Amino acid sequence: MPDPMDTRAAWLSTPNHAMVEMARDLGYGKFVLDIEHGLFDFDPTDKLIALIKAMGLEVYAKVLGPTAVPIQQALDMGCDGVIIPHIGNLAHARKVTATAKYPPLGVRSFAGSRTSGYGGADDQWYADENTRSKCFPMIESAAALADVEAIVALDTVDGLFLGPSDLSLSRGRGAYRESDADMADLERAAEAANAAGKPWIMPAWTENERQAASALGAAFMVVADEYGSIFNGLFQARH
């Protein structure tokens, strides 16, 4: 019987080693680092990624933005994949996701870092690294959703990360409420990934979201975030 924790991930907003250890002890095997909105400087981020990988766990970086340098830095540090925010239309997605893959697939620049054993690389290593490191553009804008079927078909794209809150804002609905329109947008993106045979991920903070994500075939879902976990613990302790 599949372990349900295989489809659960924890979300970090700071380089919190203790939370990684606690989550690991509770069965979490995947972590998303919210570098875009969180408090991550280079040195502690590098150490956190090294710790997570030394534990044999998976780590994905939601990078600062859709540009080459933050994407390459996260991959050079050893992340299993990058989650790229602020993706626009197909042309934009094609240009941005190319920075996550080495030639001939893309234009990623080489660094003799953790992923290459701090040394050089041969042709097979480049091919293997293109397979190992995953690229997940975010579908969180009206433009990205309009082109989602073409975006997920790109050779430089390994899957999708759905951003419900920003997608609802971009689509003119205001705050995300898990409305029928919200869920229809998420279903379209999920079905595009499923049809392409590629995984997709989403944050699923509520039981309704988790059930919907599971029914639609999410590869995994982010179900616990650092700030929310602390807040909820403090709130519950008042009573």
Regions found by a protein language model. Name each.
Residues 1-13, 121-131, 187-195:
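N-terminal amphipathic alpha-helix/helix-capping segment at the start of soluble metabolic enzymes
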Residues 1-59, 63-67, 98, 135, ...:
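Conserved N-terminal beta1-alpha1 strand-loop-helix module at the mouth
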Residues 21, 25, 61, 66-80, ...:
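Catalytic cores of alpha/beta
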Residues 31-32, 83, 161, 201, ...:
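Conserved beta-strand positions in the central sheet of alpha/beta enzyme cores
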Residues 42-68, 72-76, 98-106, 127-131, ...:
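Alpha-helix-loop-beta-strand connector modules within alpha/beta enzyme cores
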Residues 48, 52, 90-106, 174, ...:
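C-terminal helical cap(s) of enzyme catalytic domains, especially alpha/beta-barrels
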Residues 67, 108-121, 133, 139-146, ...:
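C-terminal alpha-helical cap/extension of soluble enzyme domains
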Residues 69, 81-155, 164-169:
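Conserved anion-binding
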